[in-house]
Protein backbone atom coordinates (compact mmCIF):
# COMPACT_ATOMS: atom_id res chain seq x y z
CA UNK A 1 0.00 0.00 0.00
CA UNK A 2 0.98 3.63 -0.46
CA UNK A 3 1.70 5.34 2.87
CA UNK A 4 0.11 8.68 3.66
CA UNK A 5 3.55 10.31 3.91
CA UNK A 6 6.85 9.33 2.28
CA UNK A 7 9.37 11.17 4.47
CA UNK A 8 8.69 12.10 8.07
CA UNK A 9 10.34 13.31 11.24
CA UNK A 10 9.23 11.66 14.47
CA UNK A 11 9.58 13.78 17.61
CA UNK A 12 9.47 12.03 21.00
CA UNK A 13 9.98 13.72 24.33
CA UNK A 14 12.68 12.55 26.67
CA UNK A 15 10.02 12.10 29.34
CA UNK A 16 8.34 9.48 27.14
CA UNK A 17 11.45 7.31 27.38
CA UNK A 18 11.12 7.11 31.16
CA UNK A 19 8.04 4.92 30.97
CA UNK A 20 6.78 4.56 34.53
CA UNK A 21 10.18 5.33 35.98
CA UNK A 22 10.90 8.70 37.51
CA UNK A 23 14.18 9.18 35.68
CA UNK A 24 16.34 7.77 32.92
CA UNK A 25 15.53 5.31 30.16
CA UNK A 26 13.03 2.46 30.18
CA UNK A 27 14.50 0.12 27.58
CA UNK A 28 11.12 -1.48 26.88
CA UNK A 29 9.74 1.92 25.83
CA UNK A 30 12.69 2.59 23.53
CA UNK A 31 12.29 -0.90 22.05
CA UNK A 32 8.62 -0.19 21.32
CA UNK A 33 9.48 3.07 19.56
CA UNK A 34 12.14 1.21 17.56
CA UNK A 35 9.58 -1.42 16.52
CA UNK A 36 7.19 1.30 15.39
CA UNK A 37 9.94 2.91 13.33
CA UNK A 38 10.77 -0.46 11.75
CA UNK A 39 7.11 -0.82 10.83
CA UNK A 40 7.20 2.57 9.10
CA UNK A 41 10.30 1.56 7.17
CA UNK A 42 8.52 -1.58 5.96
CA UNK A 43 6.03 0.73 4.23
CA UNK A 44 8.82 2.48 2.37
CA UNK A 45 8.71 5.58 4.59
CA UNK A 46 11.93 7.50 5.22
CA UNK A 47 12.21 8.30 8.94
CA UNK A 48 14.15 10.93 10.84
CA UNK A 49 13.89 11.12 14.63
CA UNK A 50 14.38 13.83 17.24
CA UNK A 51 14.30 12.90 20.93
CA UNK A 52 14.24 15.35 23.82
CA UNK A 53 16.42 15.06 26.89
CA UNK A 54 14.01 15.82 29.71
CA UNK A 55 14.25 12.33 31.17
CA UNK A 56 17.86 13.11 32.04
CA UNK A 57 18.24 16.88 32.23
CA UNK A 58 16.33 20.07 31.44
CA UNK A 59 18.19 23.34 30.93
CA UNK A 60 15.26 25.45 32.12
CA UNK A 61 15.50 23.71 35.50
CA UNK A 62 18.96 25.20 35.96
CA UNK A 63 17.76 28.67 35.02
CA UNK A 64 14.79 28.46 37.40
CA UNK A 65 17.21 27.97 40.28
CA UNK A 66 19.44 30.88 39.33
CA UNK A 67 21.94 28.96 37.21
CA UNK A 68 23.21 29.85 33.76
CA UNK A 69 20.60 28.98 31.13
CA UNK A 70 23.16 28.59 28.36
CA UNK A 71 25.15 26.00 30.30
CA UNK A 72 21.94 24.28 31.30
CA UNK A 73 20.82 24.03 27.69
CA UNK A 74 24.20 22.64 26.69
CA UNK A 75 23.76 19.94 29.32
CA UNK A 76 20.31 19.21 27.91
CA UNK A 77 21.80 18.81 24.44
CA UNK A 78 24.15 16.15 25.81
CA UNK A 79 21.13 14.35 27.27
CA UNK A 80 19.57 14.16 23.80
CA UNK A 81 22.72 12.45 22.54
CA UNK A 82 22.40 9.80 25.26
CA UNK A 83 18.79 9.16 24.28
CA UNK A 84 19.67 9.06 20.59
CA UNK A 85 22.35 6.44 21.19
CA UNK A 86 19.83 4.39 23.17
CA UNK A 87 17.39 4.45 20.25
CA UNK A 88 20.13 3.53 17.79
CA UNK A 89 20.96 0.53 19.99
CA UNK A 90 17.31 -0.60 20.09
CA UNK A 91 17.05 -0.28 16.32
CA UNK A 92 20.25 -2.28 15.83
CA UNK A 93 18.83 -5.10 17.97
CA UNK A 94 16.06 -5.62 15.41
CA UNK A 95 18.29 -5.24 12.38
CA UNK A 96 17.47 -1.64 11.49
CA UNK A 97 20.38 0.52 10.39
CA UNK A 98 20.42 3.94 12.03
CA UNK A 99 22.88 6.78 12.28
CA UNK A 100 23.07 9.57 14.86
CA UNK A 101 23.83 13.03 13.48
CA UNK A 102 24.57 15.59 16.17
CA UNK A 103 24.29 19.37 16.03
CA UNK A 104 27.24 19.51 18.43
CA UNK A 105 30.50 17.86 17.40
CA UNK A 106 31.47 14.69 19.25
CA UNK A 107 33.16 12.54 16.60
CA UNK A 108 33.99 9.66 18.93
CA UNK A 109 30.28 9.04 19.49
CA UNK A 110 28.42 10.17 16.38
CA UNK A 111 28.68 12.14 13.18
CA UNK A 112 28.07 15.87 12.91
CA UNK A 113 24.84 16.97 11.25
CA UNK A 114 24.72 18.07 7.65
CA UNK A 115 21.65 18.24 5.48
CA UNK A 116 23.38 16.53 2.57
CA UNK A 117 24.55 13.61 4.69
CA UNK A 118 21.15 13.23 6.33
CA UNK A 119 19.43 13.01 2.94
CA UNK A 120 22.00 10.52 1.67
CA UNK A 121 21.43 8.24 4.64
CA UNK A 122 17.65 8.46 4.30
CA UNK A 123 17.85 7.72 0.57
CA UNK A 124 19.84 4.61 1.53
CA UNK A 125 17.00 3.44 3.78
CA UNK A 126 18.66 4.26 7.10
CA UNK A 127 16.95 5.90 10.05
CA UNK A 128 18.53 9.26 10.83
CA UNK A 129 18.45 10.30 14.49
CA UNK A 130 19.04 14.02 14.94
CA UNK A 131 20.75 14.71 18.29
CA UNK A 132 21.92 17.85 20.06
CA UNK A 133 18.81 19.94 19.41
CA UNK A 134 19.53 22.87 17.10
CA UNK A 135 23.01 23.18 18.60
CA UNK A 136 22.03 26.53 20.12
CA UNK A 137 20.71 27.41 23.59
CA UNK A 138 17.20 28.82 24.09
CA UNK A 139 15.73 26.54 21.41
CA UNK A 140 13.72 23.47 22.34
CA UNK A 141 13.96 20.05 20.76
CA UNK A 142 10.48 20.73 19.32
CA UNK A 143 12.05 23.60 17.39
CA UNK A 144 14.89 21.27 16.39
CA UNK A 145 12.36 18.76 15.06
CA UNK A 146 10.58 21.42 13.00
CA UNK A 147 13.92 22.72 11.72
CA UNK A 148 15.16 19.28 10.68
CA UNK A 149 11.80 18.52 9.06
CA UNK A 150 12.13 21.68 6.97
CA UNK A 151 15.76 20.97 6.10
CA UNK A 152 15.12 17.46 4.80
CA UNK A 153 11.85 18.31 3.07
CA UNK A 154 9.71 16.10 5.31
CA UNK A 155 6.08 15.56 4.33
CA UNK A 156 5.01 15.63 7.98
CA UNK A 157 6.26 16.09 11.52
CA UNK A 158 4.94 13.44 13.91
CA UNK A 159 4.75 14.60 17.53
CA UNK A 160 4.46 11.66 19.93
CA UNK A 161 2.81 12.77 23.16
CA UNK A 162 1.22 11.33 26.29
CA UNK A 163 -2.30 11.52 24.75
CA UNK A 164 -3.80 10.64 21.37
CA UNK A 165 -4.12 14.11 19.86
CA UNK A 166 -4.71 17.79 20.52
CA UNK A 167 -7.29 18.69 23.17
CA UNK A 168 -8.77 22.00 24.29
CA UNK A 169 -7.34 21.22 27.75
CA UNK A 170 -5.35 18.43 29.36
CA UNK A 171 -7.75 15.44 29.19
CA UNK A 172 -5.97 13.86 32.15
CA UNK A 173 -7.06 16.81 34.29
CA UNK A 174 -10.24 18.06 32.60
CA UNK A 175 -13.02 15.58 31.83
CA UNK A 176 -14.67 18.18 29.56
CA UNK A 177 -11.63 18.59 27.31
CA UNK A 178 -12.55 18.48 23.62
CA UNK A 179 -10.39 16.52 21.19
CA UNK A 180 -9.70 17.94 17.74
CA UNK A 181 -9.39 15.75 14.65
CA UNK A 182 -8.11 18.66 12.58
CA UNK A 183 -6.85 22.10 13.58
CA UNK A 184 -4.76 24.87 12.04
CA UNK A 185 -1.30 25.98 13.08
CA UNK A 186 -2.72 29.44 13.79
CA UNK A 187 -5.44 28.09 16.08
CA UNK A 188 -2.88 26.11 18.08
CA UNK A 189 -0.85 29.28 18.58
CA UNK A 190 -3.87 31.52 19.24
CA UNK A 191 -5.44 29.19 21.80
CA UNK A 192 -2.13 28.38 23.49
CA UNK A 193 -2.59 24.64 23.01
CA UNK A 194 0.50 23.07 24.56
CA UNK A 195 1.57 20.57 21.92
CA UNK A 196 4.82 22.27 20.86
CA UNK A 197 6.41 25.63 21.49
CA UNK A 198 5.28 28.56 19.36
CA UNK A 199 8.54 28.78 17.41
CA UNK A 200 8.24 25.15 16.30
CA UNK A 201 4.63 25.52 15.20
CA UNK A 202 5.39 28.76 13.33
CA UNK A 203 8.34 27.13 11.54
CA UNK A 204 6.17 24.19 10.50
CA UNK A 205 3.46 26.57 9.28
CA UNK A 206 5.89 28.68 7.25
CA UNK A 207 7.19 25.56 5.52
CA UNK A 208 3.77 23.96 4.99
CA UNK A 209 4.62 20.98 7.19
CA UNK A 210 1.63 19.29 8.83
CA UNK A 211 2.09 18.24 12.45
CA UNK A 212 0.58 14.87 13.36
CA UNK A 213 -0.05 14.60 17.10
CA UNK A 214 -0.52 11.07 18.44
CA UNK A 215 0.19 8.91 21.47
CA UNK A 216 3.78 7.71 21.55
CA UNK A 217 2.70 4.97 23.95
CA UNK A 218 0.26 3.26 21.55
CA UNK A 219 2.19 0.39 20.01
CA UNK A 220 1.56 0.36 16.27
CA UNK A 221 -0.01 3.81 16.34
CA UNK A 222 2.68 5.40 14.18
CA UNK A 223 2.26 2.83 11.43
CA UNK A 224 -1.53 2.93 11.63
CA UNK A 225 -1.51 6.65 10.85
CA UNK A 226 0.90 6.14 7.97
CA UNK A 227 -1.53 3.54 6.60
CA UNK A 228 -4.36 6.11 6.66
CA UNK A 229 -6.00 5.19 9.97
CA UNK A 230 -5.02 5.49 13.60
CA UNK A 231 -5.82 8.04 16.28
CA UNK A 232 -4.32 11.48 15.88
CA UNK A 233 -4.89 15.18 15.37
CA UNK A 234 -3.66 16.72 12.13
CA UNK A 235 -2.39 20.28 12.43
CA UNK A 236 -2.24 22.00 9.04
CA UNK A 237 -3.83 24.78 7.03
CA UNK A 238 -5.77 22.73 4.48
CA UNK A 239 -9.13 24.56 4.07
CA UNK A 240 -10.90 21.50 2.64
CA UNK A 241 -9.82 19.33 5.57
CA UNK A 242 -10.86 22.03 8.01
CA UNK A 243 -14.31 22.25 6.45
CA UNK A 244 -14.72 18.47 6.55
CA UNK A 245 -13.61 18.30 10.20
CA UNK A 246 -16.12 20.96 11.25
CA UNK A 247 -19.02 19.41 9.30
Swiss-Prot record:
Keywords: Allosteric enzyme, ATP-binding, Cytoplasm, Kinase, Nucleotide-binding, Pyrimidine biosynthesis, Transferase. GO terms for cellular component: cytosol. Pathway: Pyrimidine metabolism; CTP biosynthesis via de novo pathway; UDP from UMP (UMPK route): step 1/1. It catalyses: UMP + ATP = UDP + ADP. One of its GO terms (biological process) is UDP biosynthetic process. Residues 19-24 are annotated as: Involved in allosteric activation by GTP. GO terms for molecular function: ATP binding; UMP kinase activity. The keyword Repeat does not apply. ATP binds at residues 11-14, 54, 58, 161-162, 167, 170. UMP binds at residues 53, 73, 134-141. Its EC number is 2.7.4.22. It is an enzyme of class 2 (transferase). Belongs to the UMP kinase family. Catalyzes the reversible phosphorylation of UMP to UDP. This is Uridylate kinase. The gene is pyrH.
